[in-house]
């Protein structure tokens, strides 16, 4: 089933112009993540950020996040792009920013990381979904990769939040849910809107 995307009609000097709501928001330098962090959503977000940087590298990009999380690899690709481009990326949590999405929320420009009052934030260690199968050697390779990814995420959260690495390691062992206020105290965001 396809998703219904509202159309916006605007008056211009040449008459009426219609476009989908997401294209209109992009004109205002708004990028949205709604749903899982996947290869497809990451590709779209990265392309939009690169486009907005090429259009004007001196203006902020406003990145709205409502996501339970998803692929760590794709989340890191978005985060790397946020760090690569010259524009400041302001992050705003609406609804939820879980797992990989909480990393994106925290990766916004310092002083420009926000959450709406009823937002929820979740951090936890990475996992493999879908059932792992294979030979012992292959499972060991996956286990080693997961351990390295966990260490990288712990270090990244520590750097982004200012929390000691030992606290991050402890908190990420299990699902750790936070309200917007708790996320602010933790250093994942700077302000509640």
Swiss-Prot record:
Keyword Cytoplasm carried by entry: yes
Signal peptide: none
GO CC term (a single one): endopeptidase Clp complex
GO molecular function: ATP-dependent peptidase activity; ATPase binding; serine-type endopeptidase activity
UniProt xrefs under SUPFAM superfamilies: ClpP/crotonase
Subcellular location: Cytoplasm
Domain of life: Bacteria
Catalytic activity from the UniProt record: Hydrolysis of proteins to small peptides in the presence of ATP and magnesium. alpha-casein is the usual test substrate. In the absence of ATP, only oligopeptides shorter than five residues are hydrolyzed (such as succinyl-Leu-Tyr-|-NHMec, and Leu-Tyr-Leu-|-Tyr-Trp, in which cleavage of the -Tyr-|-Leu- and -Tyr-|-Trp bonds also occurs)
GO BP, one annotated term: protein quality control for misfolded or incompletely synthesized proteins
EC supergroup of this enzyme: hydrolase
Entry-linked PANTHER family: ATP-DEPENDENT CLP PROTEASE PROTEOLYTIC SUBUNIT, ATP-DEPENDENT CLP PROTEASE PROTEOLYTIC SUBUNIT, MITOCHONDRIAL
Family: Belongs to the peptidase S14 family.
HAMAP family cross-referenced by the UniProt entry: ClpP (MF_00444)
Assembly with partners or alone: Fourteen ClpP subunits assemble into 2 heptameric rings which stack back to back to give a disk-like structure with a central cavity, resembling the structure of eukaryotic proteasomes.
Name of this protein: ATP-dependent Clp protease proteolytic subunit 1
Species, as recorded: Desulfitobacterium hafniense (strain Y51)
